[in-house]
């Protein structure tokens, strides 16, 4: 049986080496996020200040996989 993963939204607060980021979730938790392979393959840039969707395992709630970069409301891209 496949493990159930929780999906949260958060804000990138800090960029770390090797595609890792510090993410502040909407419930104010601070976790470590890494970029999923699909985002890495598509060369999607993630910068501090971006809003993202992050997938967190129920076994380790301190790490998560960034699965989607949300569009900013004020930018035109």
UniProtKB/Swiss-Prot annotation:
Q: What is the lineage of its organism?
A: Eukaryota, Viridiplantae, Streptophyta, Embryophyta, Tracheophyta
The record, for CDD domains, names:
S1_IF1 (cd04451)
Q: Which gene encodes it?
A: infA
Q: Which UniProt keywords apply?
A: Chloroplast, Initiation factor, Plastid, Protein biosynthesis, RNA-binding, rRNA-binding
Q: Which Pfam families match?
A: eIF-1a
Domain S1-like, by residue range, is 1-71
What name appears for this protein in its UniProt entry? Translation initiation factor IF-1, chloroplastic
Q: Which GO terms describe its cellular component?
A: chloroplast; cytosol
Q: Which organism is it from?
A: Calycanthus floridus var. glaucus
Q: From the Swiss-Prot or TrEMBL record, state where the protein is found.
A: Plastid, Chloroplast
């Amino acid at each position: 049986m496949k493990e159930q993963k929780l999906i949260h939204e958060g804000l990138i607060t800090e960029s770390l080496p090797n595609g890792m980021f510090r993410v502040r979730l909407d419930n104010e938790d601070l976790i470590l996020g890494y970029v999923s392979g699909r985002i890495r393959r598509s060369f999607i840039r993630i910068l501090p200040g971006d809003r993202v969707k992050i997938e967190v395992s129920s076994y380790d709630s301190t790490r998560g996989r960034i699965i989607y970069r949300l569009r900013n409301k004020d930018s035109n891209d």
